[in-house]
A protein has these predicted regions:
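Conserved helix-loop functional segments at active or binding sites
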Residues: 1, 18, 29, 59, ...
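C-terminal capping alpha-helices of c-type cytochrome domains
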Residues: 1-5, 58, 79-81, 85-91, ...
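Residue-level signal for short amphipathic helical patches enriched in basic/charged
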Residues: 19-22, 44, 48, 127-131
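Gly/Gly-Pro-rich "capping" loops immediately C-terminal to redox-active cysteine motifs
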Residues: 33-59, 64, 69-115
Length: 145
């Protein structure tokens, strides 16, 4: 069993929204609260079991949905910008890791590289205690929240 023991949904909610260490809601939404950099985690427990959730927390770059794979844009003026590509047409729109959208003319772009590393750092959960990790997983699995 992934991280066995008792857990508190209430403490998990606090960790998700208010922990400066985990900072989950700085990138993820849950029930309409949080940021829009990474996937909305409202229904994540319907898409994965506890073991899958834990693996995503431990190794976020292992499996990334294509729409959340970061890209690096190199502009002709030498600047490098990293973000999630939102759309590409006449302008390239990139959402940075703070949730800010930036738009660039295709004519200003030298090259676009798709990256293999998620914005979510590997090992982020190692800064949480086992209890905090259980609480966070319980919150993400709770459908009554």
């Amino acid at each position: 069993q992934a991280v066995p023991g008792s857990a508190s949904v209430t403490n998990g909610r606090r960790i998700f929204y208010h922990s400066p260490v985990a900072a989950c809601s700085s990138c993820h939404r849950h029930r309409g609260r949080g940021n829009v950099v990474g996937p909305d985690l409202t229904n994540v427990s319907m898409q994965s079991d506890r073991k899958g959730l834990l693996e995503s927390l431990l190794q976020p770059s292992l499996v990334m949905a294509p729409q959340y794979r970061p890209s690096m844009i190199v502009l002709k003026d030498g600047r490098n910008l990293t973000g999630i590509r939102l759309r590409s047409w006449v302008n390239e729109v990139l959402r940075d890791n703070k949730g800010k959208n930036r738009s660039f003319s295709r004519s200003d772009i030298e090259i676009i590289h798709e990256l293999d590393e998620s914005f979510m750092p590997n090992g982020l959960v190692h800064v949480l205690t086992d209890r905090e990790l259980r609480d966070l997983l319980a919150f993400l699995e709770d459908s009554d929240d």
